[in-house]
Amino acid sequence: VMNLWPGIRLRVTEGWDEDGHHSEESLHYEGRAVDITTEDRDRNKYAMLARLAVEAGF
């Protein structure tokens, strides 16, 4: 992310869910999922952000 978008940081919007905001099978209830975005909330970056996460092993 730092190399692709200098000065843009990641935002973690949720990691653990105990309020039932996700689907019944969601890994958020086990603490094995995370919702992230970029600090500028630019939706045009989301596809690449997902690709970077997969390449990093997430």
UniProtKB/Swiss-Prot annotation:
Binding-site residues, Ca(2+) 1: 13-14
Binding site for Zn(2+): 28, 35
Post-translational modification: The C-terminal domain displays an autoproteolysis activity and a cholesterol transferase activity. Both activities result in the cleavage of the full-length protein and covalent attachment of a cholesterol moiety to the C-terminal of the newly generated N-terminal fragment (N-product). The N-product is the active species in both local and long-range signaling, whereas the C-product has no signaling activity. Cholesterylation is required for N-product targeting to lipid rafts and multimerization.
InterPro entries: Hedgehog, Hedgehog_sig/DD-Pept_Zn-bd_sf, Hedgehog_Signaling, Hedgehog_signalling_dom
Keyword field: Autocatalytic cleavage, Calcium, Cell membrane, Developmental protein, Hydrolase, Lipoprotein, Membrane, Metal-binding, Palmitate, Protease, Secreted, Zinc
Signal peptide: none
Localization: Cell membrane; Secreted, Extracellular space
One example of a Gene Ontology biological process annotation: smoothened signaling pathway
One Gene Ontology molecular-function label: patched binding
Pfam families per UniProt: HH_signal
Domain of life: Eukaryota
Chief localisation class: membrane
SUPFAM superfamilies: Hedgehog/DD-peptidase
Chain residues that bind Ca(2+) 2: 14, 17, 19
GO terms for cellular component: extracellular space; plasma membrane
Listed PANTHER family: HEDGEHOG, INDIAN HEDGEHOG PROTEIN
Recorded domain comment: The indian hedgehog protein N-product binds calcium and zinc ions; this stabilizes the protein fold and is essential for protein-protein interactions mediated by this domain.
Function, in words: Intercellular signal essential for a variety of patterning events during development.
Family: Belongs to the hedgehog family.
Protein name from the UniProt record: Indian hedgehog protein
Species the sequence originates in: Devario malabaricus (Malabar danio)
